[in-house]
């Protein structure tokens, strides 16, 4: 068991180091984005919502086709991938990195590796469910996809995408400040109250 844990830790360290090397040119931008997403200042949440809202208003106004939208998005990614490693050191000054910044960059890369591992793990579990319990797999997939299709049909796709993107960008800050845990705790308490009231009525 200990050997397996050590092997997993060593593999995590190797993957993290590899990712750090790949994203070295993005280090300054990632640290800045990390501060924004974790709401280190009070005005960051409204700024996130404002930028996302402006972006989606532009998309709504231009009303591009799917092909044009995908092409522009990929083109933007290519430009960012080329320009960010060149411009970021000049803007932020990578030679001024502190030990704390380096440690935080390491933590971000480690969290990204862990997230990728979780996603791969869920993907593998899905396929193992398909092999072990095919009926449950197909029923679950059909019901889930039908629900998603129904929601997509009822709600405007651009609005739905806007809500999803906004929630995903606000999620790190919500977790950092314990807001999600707070409301989950409130929901659990309310559910427990309802269950207790139901038990009393049954008695």
UniProtKB/Swiss-Prot annotation:
Family in the record? Belongs to the ARL6ip family.
Q: What is this protein called?
A: ADP-ribosylation factor-like protein 6-interacting protein 1
Q: How does it assemble?
A: Homooligomer. Heterodimer with ARL6IP5. Interacts with ARL6. Interacts with TMEM33. Interacts with ATL1.
Kindly list the places in or outside the cell where this protein is found, as annotated in its UniProt entry: Endomembrane system; Endoplasmic reticulum membrane; Endoplasmic reticulum
The domain-related comment in the record is: The transmembrane domains are required for its ability to shape the endoplasmic reticulum membrane into tubules.
Q: Which superkingdom does the taxonomy of this entry point to?
A: Eukaryota
Q: Note the topology in the membrane.
A: Multi-pass membrane protein
Q: Which regions face the Cytoplasmic side of the membrane?
A: 1-41, 87-133
């Amino acid at each position: 068991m200990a050997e397996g844990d050590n092997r997993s830790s060593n593999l995590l360290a190797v993957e993290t180091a590899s990712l750090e090397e790949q994203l070295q040119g993005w280090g300054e931008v990632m640290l800045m984005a990390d501060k924004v997403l974790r709401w280190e200042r009070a005005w960051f949440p409204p700024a996130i919502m404002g930028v996302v809202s402006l972006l989606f208003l532009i998309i709504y106004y231009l009303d591009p086709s799917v092909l044009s939208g995908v092409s522009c998005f990929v083109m933007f990614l290519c430009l960012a991938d080329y320009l960010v490693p060149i411009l970021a050191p000049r803007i932020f000054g990578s030679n001024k990195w502190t030990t704390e910044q380096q440690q935080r960059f390491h933590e971000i890369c480690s969290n990204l590796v862990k997230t990728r591992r979780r996603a791969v793990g869920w993907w593998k579990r899905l396929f193992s469910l398909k092999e072990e319990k095919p009926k449950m797999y197909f029923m679950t997939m059909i019901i889930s996809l039908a629900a998603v299709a129904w929601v997509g049909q009822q709600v405007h796709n651009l609005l739905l995408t806007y809500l999803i993107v906004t929630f995903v960008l606000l999620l790190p800050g919500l977790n950092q400040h314990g807001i999600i845990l707070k409301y989950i705790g409130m929901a659990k308490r309310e559910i427990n109250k309802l269950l207790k009231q139901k038990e009393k009525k049954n008695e």
